Amino acid sequence: AGMRLGFAVANPELINSVFTVKNSFNHFPVDFLAQTAGKAACKNYSYYEENAKKIVNERILLTEFLRSKNWFVIESKTNFIFAKKDGMSGTSIYEAVKKEGILIRHFNTPGIEDFVRITIGTKEQMDKLKKVLVEI
């Protein structure tokens, strides 16, 4: 998450509107390293496509696992899931996995304070997380 590079696809009118106001909130700096990484990524599409498939697969497996353990999981099409376990606070889940060296996100925002956001990692990382979640 140290370097981010993105792109937008939109109606030309909308893109022009974004460029009209961009300097008032963000000038979209893209340094040389990000540009170089972006070029390399475009040249190796199959690598990223394969990684995306792995992330989707691990997300599905984690969602199914959590639901089988009576967690409420919001449907996701991203590289993370948003979930909660009845009877457990988001803080207690966060602290329990943190003790095992696993970092997830917890928000103290009213309405979502019992949810955690879990970023999908490698199979090994997700297996470790599942093991920890069963124990709490």
Which sequence ranges carry the predicted segments?
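PLP-dependent enzyme catalytic core of the Aspartate aminotransferase-like
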Residues: 96-100, 104-105, 109-136
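Phosphate- and divalent-cation-binding pockets in alpha/beta enzyme and binding domains
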Residues: 17, 37, 84, 92, ...
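Conserved PLP-binding catalytic core of the aspartate aminotransferase-like
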Residues: 55-56, 60, 64-100, 116
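Short acidic/glycine-enriched loop/turn segments that link adjacent beta-strands
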Residues: 2, 77, 111-114
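Short hydrophobic/aromatic beta-strand micro-patches
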Residues: 9, 82-84, 119-121
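Residue-level detector of flexible, active-site-proximal loop/helix-junction positions
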Residues: 25, 80, 111
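Thr-Gly-centered strand-to-loop micro-motif
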Residues: 3, 83-84, 104-106
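PLP-dependent aminotransferase class I/II
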Residues: 1-66, 71-74
